[in-house]
């Protein structure tokens, strides 16, 4: 995660802290500009450069370049629309890990010391942001099974078993 953020910062000219804090934040003004086809579209078409794009688009494009560079070698990329960015590659294992809300709250309470209410609020906000980010940049639905090769319920399997299953699937896919 940190390495990808730092590489994207170098690529975009933005600070690592800015990217880390804003990579999944899609503002309503960005969504409005996206719908209206305002100035950033000129940058996407190569007519105005990336500086005419909203910062969120600059961050996404910088991360996209870094993800594509990393994917030239064996690697693990968590999130960041990597399944979409690498959709043309055939040697990619696309995994979605999920758990019930009850299991996720339990984990957040245990790992971060949150109250159950705070855990629910943080998870709901995070899920909403991820879904909005994913839909904005991919036009796909976050968590849609059609976008993944493997989906695992870490709540019922446990984190270690899910990790072992992913490793096994990746090894089998290499054969």
Each model region followed by its residue ranges:
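Short, amphipathic alpha-helical "lid/cap" segments that border enzyme active or binding sites
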Residues: 64, 159-167
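RNA pseudouridine synthases
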Residues: 70, 75, 81-89
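A common structural junction motif
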Residues: 170-175
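A short beta-strand-loop structural module common to alpha/beta enzyme folds
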Residues: 1-5
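ATP-dependent small-molecule kinase phosphotransfer cores
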Residues: 7-74
């Amino acid at each position: 995660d940190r390495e990808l953020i730092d590489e994207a910062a170098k690529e975009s000219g933005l600070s690592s802290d800015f990217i880390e804090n804003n990579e999944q934040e899609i503002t309503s003004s960005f969504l409005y500009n996206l719908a209206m086809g305002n100035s950033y579209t000129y940058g996407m078409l190569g007519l105005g450069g990336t500086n005419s794009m909203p910062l969120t688009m600059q961050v996404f494009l910088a991360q996209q370049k870094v993800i594509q560079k990393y994917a030239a070698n064996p690697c693990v990329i968590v999130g960041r629309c990597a399944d979409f960015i690498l959709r043309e590659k055939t040697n990619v294992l696309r995994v979605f890990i999920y758990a019930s809300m009850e299991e996720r709250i339990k984990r957040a309470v245990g790992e971060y010391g949150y109250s159950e209410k705070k855990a629910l609020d943080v998870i709901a906000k995070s899920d909403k942001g991820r879904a909005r980010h994913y839909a904005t940049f991919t036009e796909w639905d976050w968590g849609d099974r059609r976008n993944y090769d493997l989906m695992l319920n870490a709540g019922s399997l446990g984190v270690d078993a899910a990790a072992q299953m992913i490793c096994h699937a990746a090894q089998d896919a290499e054969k």
